[in-house]
Amino acid sequence: SGAAGALAHAFRLVTEPGDEILTFAPFFPEYHPYVDLTGAVLKVVPPNLENFQINFEAFEEMLTEKVKAVLINTPNNPSGVVYSTPTLQRLADILREKSKEYGHIIYLISDEPYREIVFEGVDSPCVSYFYDNTIMCYSFSKSLSLPGERIGYVAVNPACEDAETMINMCGQISRGIGHNCPPSIIQLAVAQVLDKTADLSVYETNMNILYKELLDLGFNCVK
């Protein structure tokens, strides 16, 4: 069921009712109902308005013992920001430190449907390289222009402490919430084009048009 189904699995893998998940503004609004359905609570870290990298001062204040997961979306919808290597490294360092302090793993859930949609040499680092306890949620809707096919996956970092258990739990969660496999024909088709994308240049063209128009209107924009 695409990244939506992947996120639904990830939230259930790592939380119980009453636990908290932190995410960063601005964010995809459907995160709220996805988390609400698990009984967990989504809390939103206010943005760094200068460049939309993580507001670490606010983040560390909100990272309490009740937090069981941190949800990031990079490249981000709707801001377009790509979290830099220094940002991800600092985030990972904080999560390791707080996991040790609180005596439980704080998982990092990385929502990555826009992973390939970066332009002008911008680096989009692989989140799981920075933090072992990462769960990655992906959709082919954007990279292959297949939004109606609902095809994606949830991947657990092999270095994650509970990787083996979590993979098995995903099957049980699928049965419990009705997110069964997409049709086999689209799974087989996507498997043949894992190293390819649709023509993404139209997105770059649209980006440049919007950027120019916003500047002409007097807005300050980060590109």
Ranges and model annotations:
Residues S1-G103, E116-F130:
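Conserved core of the PLP fold type I
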Residues A69, Y107-L108, I135:
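Hydrophobic "anchor" residues on beta-strands that sit immediately upstream
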Residues E112-Y114:
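Conserved Walker B
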Residues S1, S110, Y138:
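Short loop/edge segments at beta-strand edges and connector loops
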Residues V44-P46, M136-Y138, K223:
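Structural signal for conserved beta-strand scaffold positions within catalytic alpha/beta enzyme cores
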Residues N133-E204, N208-F219:
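Conserved core segment of the aminotransferase class I/II
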Residues E97-I106, E213, L217:
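A structural motif corresponding to the C-terminal end of an alpha-helix
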